Swiss-Prot record:
One Gene Ontology term from the biological process aspect of the record: cobalamin biosynthetic process
Keyword annotations: Cobalamin biosynthesis, Glycosyltransferase, Transferase
Transferase found in the keyword field: yes
Pathway membership: Nucleoside biosynthesis; alpha-ribazole biosynthesis; alpha-ribazole from 5,6-dimethylbenzimidazole: step 1/2
Family of the protein in this entry: Belongs to the CobT family.
Reactions it catalyzes: 5,6-dimethylbenzimidazole + nicotinate beta-D-ribonucleotide = alpha-ribazole 5'-phosphate + nicotinate + H(+)
Pfam families (UniProt xref): DBI_PRT
Enzyme Commission no: 2.4.2.21
Broad enzyme group: transferase
Protein name: Nicotinate-nucleotide--dimethylbenzimidazole phosphoribosyltransferase
Entries under InterPro entries matching the protein: Nict_dMeBzImd_PRibTrfase, Nict_dMeBzImd_PRibTrfase_bact, Nict_dMeBzImd_PRibTrfase_N, Nict_dMeBzImd_PRibTrfase_sf
Keyword Transferase set for record: yes
Main function: Catalyzes the synthesis of alpha-ribazole-5'-phosphate from nicotinate mononucleotide (NAMN) and 5,6-dimethylbenzimidazole (DMB).
Species assigned in the record: Pseudomonas syringae pv. syringae (strain B728a)
């Protein structure tokens, strides 16, 4: 494809700043390694931000919303109109991610990529690619042109974020049926059996999970030629919001903005991004381990070290947002603690 912008290498890690941050950690008034993952997080951020003392003051949360044609197969516990209703809820401040964004003083960018019913909501950026995806149980979820537009929508949000000095980017999603699409994409990329990854999504019972699994298995057979191919798997089985998330993660890595990845659906988008451009992996931090059974498998595949494990399954970017205070505290500890020399404390046990 011409203008395959996603293949541009990610920005390089600032190794000298990372090493300087590591050296500082070793001089702080605590036993070496005692703050464990928080130490590693601060050092990692120092390398990503190119400064010995990192900070996460400017936070951008982008929510990409779209509907899914596969809902016609009866794979969701909720009706499709909920996607549009939640767009209202996001901009009216009543959704979980809206509350979290306020508390974290984050910029909230809500993007409609294609709900079934067109809407004109103040506070929502309307970048309609279509009236939801097509039913991937019968054909490709989207055309190549639609898929490229969705990738670009994610990139556009990142460029907006960069323009205001964003230091950490969180992507979230809304779309009834999107755990089905995400599971299908993951199965195609990992070339694994659907029962290993498929879960309840928004609340299916055991019978519903079995039906959802069968729908995905039929779709995987239909699109078997795309197995292992990140772009084709995304376009044949994914959703506009999943493609936008993948585009956002790729753009963040290219623009030098650290990412805090949310749950199962966002991790599938991260897998797509890494398969398209492995150099973006260094820029991805992971907020939490969710309840969806496939999430653990994805995190292992991506060699991720999530910050939280609360059994969450909401989406919207909520799990990543909940991890932001830990990220900020990791920076505060790194930046604010005294060194042994400053505190006149012996730096070795007697």
């Amino acid at each position: 494809m011409s203008n395959s912008w996603w293949l541009k290498p990610a920005q390089a890690i600032d190794v000298p700043m990372r090493e300087a941050a590591l050296a500082r950690q070793q001089q702080l008034t605590k036993p070496a390694g005692s703050l464990a993952q928080l130490e590693r997080l601060a050092v990692q951020l120092a390398g990503l931000q190119g400064r010995e003392r990192p900070a996460v003051d400017q936070l951008w949360i982008a929510i990409f919303a779209a509907d899914h044609g596969v809902v016609a197969e009866g794979v969701s516990a909720y009706p499709q109109e909920v996607t549009g209703q939640m767009l209202h809820n996001f901009v009216n401040g009543g959704a979980a991610i809206s509350v979290l964004a306020r508390q974290l003083s984050a910029q909230l960018d809500v993007v409609d990529l294609g709900t079934v019913s067109p809407m004109d909501l103040p506070g929502v950026r309307h970048l309609r690619i279509g009236a939801g995806t097509a039913n991937f149980a019968h054909g490709p979820a989207m055309s190549v042109e639609q898929g490229l537009a969705a990738l670009q929508a994610g990139r556009d949000s990142v460029l907006r974020a960069k323009a205001v000095g964003t230091e950490l980017f969180i992507g979230g999603e809304m779309g009834i049926g999107n755990t089905t699409a995400a599971s299908a994409v993951a199965c195609s990329l990992l070339e694994c059996a659907a029962p290993l990854l498929v879960g309840p999504g928004t609340g299916l019972n055991a019978e519903g999970i079995q039906h959802k699994t069968r729908v995905i298995e039929r779709a995987l057979a239909l699109h078997a030629e795309q197995a292992g191919d990140p772009l084709n798997s995304l376009f044949c089985l994914g959703g506009f919001e999943i493609a936008a998330l993948a585009g956002a993660y790729l753009a963040c890595a290219q623009e030098g903005i650290a990412v805090l990845v949310d749950g199962f659906i966002c991790s599938v988008a991260a897998l797509v991004a890494v398969r398209l451009n492995p150099s973006c992996r260094n820029w991805l931090l992971f907020g939490h381990r969710g309840a969806e059974p496939g999430h653990r498998h994805l995190l292992e595949t991506l060699q991720a070290e999530p910050l939280l494990d609360l059994g969450l399954r909401l989406g919207e970017g909520s799990g990543a947002a909940l991890a932001v205070p830990l990220v900020r505290l990791a920076c505060e500890l790194h930046n604010g603690m005294a060194t042994f020399a400053e505190a006149a404390v012996a730096d070795r046990p007697a």
